[in-house]
């Protein structure tokens, strides 16, 4: 009889260990998913900025996200309106895919020998400065409200 009780105790401890491993695996899987989403979102915005060099030159993408602005570009847009549309779409994606997702973008022309004039920018030259993007999110929002935010920082040239 004692052997059965000891066997049940050993078996239950083993099951608890297996359950703990499954919880850790699920948590790690969720963290990997969120980090993949951050990478995709950052690349998406960088590509939007690359497609709208005039908006980048004018500083229309600089700022903090999520952004509450709304711009409908179904009938055509100026570069500034397209940047506002991109900001709104990306803000929506940040809120949808990342818990407590926020970001900031800052593009500078520091160190450039010459910054183009407005007339030259209208000719759509590629952006010559650097942009920095920082995305923050919470990986453990449901488990621990005081968990530190994760961040992804990227220096790029659109």
Task: For every predicted segment, state its role.
Residues 27-158:
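Flexible, low-complexity segments enriched in proline/glycine/serine and punctuated by aromatic residues
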Residues 1-43:
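Aliphatic-rich helix starts adjacent to a transmembrane/signal segment
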């Amino acid at each position: 009889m004692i052997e059965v009780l000891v066997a049940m105790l050993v078996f239950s401890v083993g099951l608890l260990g297996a359950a703990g491993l499954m919880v850790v695996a699920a948590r790690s899987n969720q963290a990997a998913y969120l980090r993949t989403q951050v990478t995709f979102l950052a690349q998406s915005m960088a590509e939007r900025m690359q497609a709208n060099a005039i908006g980048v030159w004018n500083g229309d993408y600089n700022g903090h996200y999520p952004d509450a602005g709304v711009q409908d570009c179904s009938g055509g847009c100026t570069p500034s309106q397209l940047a506002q549309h991109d900001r709104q779409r990306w803000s929506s994606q940040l809120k949808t895919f990342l818990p407590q997702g926020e970001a900031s973008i800052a593009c500078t022309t520091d160190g450039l020998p010459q910054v183009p004039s407005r007339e030259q920018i209208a000719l759509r030259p590629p952006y010559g400065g650097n942009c920095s993007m920082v995305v923050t999110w919470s990986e453990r929002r449901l488990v621990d409200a005081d968990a530190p935010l994760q961040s992804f920082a990227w220096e790029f040239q659109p």
